[in-house]
Design a protein with these regions (language model features):
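Compositionally biased terminal segments of proteins
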Residues: 1-183
């Protein structure tokens, strides 16, 4: 695992501008490629910071106006903030958040889902990039597969629209991880 100690450009300038907009502490619960690349060291392109939560909610509109796809900060830096509404995180994910780049910003607090929770947010979409991210995380952490299964069963499965499909997806993911470990 090769996490970044310093945010590279254009991320640093983009997030510094968001930090200046915030009058008090703002927490961004980050998921997706931004977390996998910046915190866990995967080398792949990403142009957005996927966020599950902007807290307090009162700043979400201000952030949306300037930082979303097509907004002024996107025009300036080519990266954007994406408020994700379709990814389902495990129920207790907030209890396991970890801060990314502590003390980098005055008001902005970037929080990352733990690697198991991060992987499980990718379960429903299950595109190739998601599967590659999960296999990468499973390799570098390395995942305890029983913990992944348990968290899925207890904290995610009860809240899914099609749990039987996601049962199969998780089973296939675990088989792929086990194959990677055997080779």
């Amino acid at each position: 695992m090769c996490p970044r100690k310093v945010l590279p450009e254009p991320w640093l300038s983009f997030l510094n501008e968001l930090d200046r907009i915030a009058a008090s502490t703002v927490r961004l619960d980050c998921i997706g490629g931004f977390v996998v690349t910046m915190l866990y060291g995967l080398t792949r392109p990403t142009a957005d910071v996927d966020v599950l939560e902007i807290a307090p909610l009162s700043v979400a509109d201000a952030f949306s106006k300037v930082a979303m796809l097509g907004g002024p900060l996107f025009q300036k830096y080519g990266v954007y903030l994406d408020r994700v509404t379709v990814a389902q995180p495990p129920y207790e994910y907030e209890t396991r958040l970890q801060e990314m780049f502590p003390r980098t910003f005055q008001n902005l607090c970037l929080m990352a889902l733990d690697p198991y929770d991060l992987a499980l947010t990718k379960l429903e979409r299950n595109i190739e990039r998601d599967r590659n991210d999960v296999r990468y995380l499973a390799r570098i952490i390395p995942f305890e597969l029983d913990l992944l299964r348990e968290r899925y069963q207890i904290e995610l499965r009860p809240y899914l629209g099609n749990p039987k499909r996601e049962d199969l997806t998780l089973k296939l993911w675990i088989e792929a991880i086990e194959e990677d470990r055997a080779s």
